[in-house]
Regions:
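Canonical tetratricopeptide repeat
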Residues: 26, 62, 98, 134, ...
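Start-of-helix register in tetratricopeptide repeats
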Residues: 22, 58, 91-94, 127-130, ...
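Alpha-helical segment of the N-proximal tetratricopeptide repeat
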Residues: 13-50, 58, 65-69
Length: 176
């Protein structure tokens, strides 16, 4: 805890420096856990501003989660877009999947499809199969059962234990 206080500014009240992206990221996580939303946002933005190849995308993803949870959908989308644009092997695909959810909630289906497709194209072992399921859900509600069926089948074929099982259920529902 003392280290977090020191990062938060210590006796002089200085913010975490741009040269300490790991500290800023971890401070953001800690403050978020403690319910200090404004402090967490500030710390995550510090980490994002650092352009650190690991912590900037992680902070962008976490900021997207935080903002979305607190109703700032536009801010969440912007944070997720930063994570997606980073091309980070872990955070980019998951952020793309979450960005798809936000677009879907806003009935911006073309953007949702593109975001889900970006997660699928990443080949990420978790985000891609789930994006296949979510894309199938979107397409089945979008009156394109054939494309939905193809997306569900890809999720089944992925072998992901949960996503494949859920996709198989949806696929069976389309068949009946």
């Amino acid at each position: 805890m003392k280290a977090f206080r020191r990062l938060r500014g210590g006796p002089r009240g200085a913010a975490p420096s741009a040269y300490d992206p790991a500290g800023a990221f971890h401070l953001g996580a800690r403050l978020s856990e403690q319910g200090d939303v404004d402090g967490a946002k500030e710390a995550y933005r510090q980490a994002m501003d650092s352009a650190d190849p690991e912590y900037a995308p992680a902070a962008a993803y976490r900021l997207g989660l935080l903002l979305g949870r607190h109703g700032d959908i536009e801010g969440a989308k912007e944070a997720y877009r930063q994570a997606v644009n980073s091309g980070h092997r872990e955070h980019s695909p998951v952020a793309a999947r979450n960005l798809g959810h936000l677009y879907k909630r806003q009935a911006r289906y073309r953007q949702a499809i593109a975001a889900y497709q970006a997660a699928i194209d990443s080949g990420h072992p978790d985000a891609a199969p789930w994006a296949m399921v979510y894309l199938g859900n979107l397409l089945s509600g979008y009156a394109d059962p054939q494309a939905a069926r193809a997306s569900y089948q890809r999720a089944v074929d992925s072998g992901h234990p949960e996503a494949a099982r859920q996709a198989a259920r949806h696929l069976a529902g389309l068949e009946s």
